[in-house]
Amino acid sequence: LSDEVLEKAEQVLQTASQAIQAADWNQMNLIANRMLDQEMSEEQMSRATELFQIIDLAIFYRTAITDSISKLEIGNDFEVTRDFRVIVVEKSPEQLVVRYNAKNKTYTIDELPWALAHQLARFEVAGDTFSTAAKSVYQFIAPKTNDGLRDEALEWIREIQSDLDGTDKENIESTLKSLFSEKE
């Protein structure tokens, strides 16, 4: 492979890394398939596969949340956690308005409280190991996360006992850690 091809591949990998670090969902979607179609070295392809898995899991989970919101009916209520229910007041592809404690609360997708985001995703995906991995990756990279939530997400990944359909859980953890140590 020429230096030019390798440099272009490196730029694509850098763009993918930056999209993940910024939780830029649109950019992640755009770059994911382009990344795997890009000609690159074996080492670069290995990195591309790792980044693709992170993007795939995160987008899968975020899509579960947005699909769940799209299926909610105005006026319906549901349990977020034990003894905590919300009523759906309004919804759009970008936000959800729920009522609890006699107040309306408006959230964009990225601002949803974790308990609410995870409950919405559960409406769409079963509690299998793939969805646990997706939940972990989403919580790790989402804009409103913090170090404690990242540690919790890594713990969920470590607790996965079965195969992830070709996705190596150790690779997920090491890729996430390397991406976010680069960022800091």
Which residue ranges define each predicted feature?
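Compositionally biased alpha-helical segments
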Residues: 1-184
